[in-house]
Amino acid sequence: VLGDIAFDIDGAPLDLADTVTYQGMMFTGVPNLVWVFGYFRASWTLRVEMIAEVVCRMLHHMDETGRRKVVVELPPELAGEPQLPWVDRENFNPGYLMRDMHLMPKRLDREDWQHTQDYWSEKDRFAAIDIAGRAFRYE
C-alpha cells in the first residue's frame, strides 16, 4: 500500500488500516495526502481528473484562507458506523487485492466515505464536494 513507504504523523507511525477513506482519495487523520486511485473497470484517468479538480479547489481554498494543512475527519454522527473493507468483495475481488485488504483503509456504507467505482455517480458527487464542509478541517 502506497509503495511500502512508512509514513508517520508527528513521529507516530501511520497504519492506513486504522483510517477511513473519504471519496476513496483521502484518509481520516492524515494531513495533506491525496491518494490518486482510478477505476478498476473504466478509464483510470476519468477518476484521476476528478480528483485533480478537487485537489485544485482545496489548494485554492487553502491559499485564499492562509491555511497550510487539511485533514478529513468523520463527522461525530458517523463515528459509530461499521467500518467495512476498502472494496466490497462482490464488486471487485482479485487475489492480489484480497491478500492485502487488511492493510487498506476502511470505508463506510455511505457514498462519500468509499471508493464507489461508479463514474456516473462520482462525476456529479465530486463536482459538488464542499471543500469547506464538515468533512474537512483546515489549519
Language model: regions and residue ranges:
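Glycine-rich loop(s) and the adjacent beta-strand/alpha-helix scaffold that form part
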Residues: 1-44
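C-terminal, flexible cofactor-proximal segment of oxidoreductases
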Residues: 21, 32-139
